[in-house]
C-alpha cells in the first residue's frame, strides 16, 4: 500500500498531537525549531555562492522512469514489512469463532503483501487453525512455479496467478471445497496482465477474489485508469456473473468507502483510496444491487480497519483504513446470518485477514 504509507505517517503524528484536544508543541519539536533557527543564523553569516548546475548528461542519468520508481518503492516497502511485521499470530484471536456448520462455507480473504514472506512467518499453521473452506489471497507477488506443495496446508488445492511484471500484484486461492470452475482474469488483456482476479464458481454463487488497482503510488497517476477503465470493465464483468448467479466479491478493494472507514479522513481527501472519484464509483456499483456485508451488520461502527501502515506503529495505535471487503449480491444476504469478521490480531502483513460464513442451502 505504498501510496498511503507516508501520508498515514503524517496523519498519525497529527492525531497524536490532537488526541487530548490540545495543540501543544512537544519538547522534541521545540528543540528542532531552535536548531533550525540556529542554522538560519549560521547561513546568514556565510557568503552566498551560486549553486553549480549538474551537467545535463549527469542529470539525465539520475532520472528514473515511473516504473523504476514504483519498483524501488515496492521493494523498499516489502523489505521494511519483512523487518517490522511479526510472525503470523494464532494465540490472540479465537479462530474457532464463529462456529461453522456442515451446510455452511467459511471464506477468508487476506492481502498477504508477499506470499513468500508470509510462508516463512507461520502461514500454514494459521490456515490449519482458521480452517477456511476457501482462502482468497491478494498481493501474492510470486511465480506459481516457485510454490512447493510441501509448504502448503494439507487438504487444500491451490491456484495462483502472477502479474507479467515480476514481483508485482498477483492473487491466489486455496480451496477445500472444490469449485465447479476456476477463471483467471476477466478476459481483457490490459487488465489481466497484472494478475488481479480469480473467480471460483460454485453451485450457489461465484466467489471473485480481487486485488483492485491502487490509484497511485506517487500522486494519483493511475486514478484515470482505475475509474475510467478498470472499474468500468471489471464492474461489467461482475454484472455479467450476477446475471447467472449471486456473487461474493472479496479482496483488497483499495477504497475506504466512507469517512468512518479510515482514521483520519479530513487530511486524506486527495489520497489514493479515498478520493471522491473512487468512493463514488464504489457507491454507484453498490446501488446496482450489492451490499457491503460488513457495514450491513455494523452500520455506524468506527475504528474497524483492515490495513495499517507499518511506519510509526500504525497498527498498535489503530491508525488504519478499511480496504478489504466482502461485497455480495443483495439477494444472497439472507444466507449470511452473522457479521463478517476481522482477524485484527493475525500478523504477518500490513493487512489482516477478514472472513465471512455463508449458508449453502
Curated annotation (Swiss-Prot):
One GO-annotated biological process of the protein: base-excision repair
Record: residues binding Mg(2+) 1: 139, 350
Region (Disordered): 1-90
Residue sites binding Mg(2+) 2 per the record: 252, 254
Cofactor entry: Mg(2+); Mn(2+)
Record: active site: 211, 252 (proton donor/acceptor)
Basic residues composition-biased segments: 43-64
Gene3D superfamilies from the UniProt entry: Endonuclease/exonuclease/phosphatase
Family: Belongs to the DNA repair enzymes AP/ExoA family.
Entry protein name: DNA-(apurinic or apyrimidinic site) endonuclease
Organism: Dictyostelium discoideum
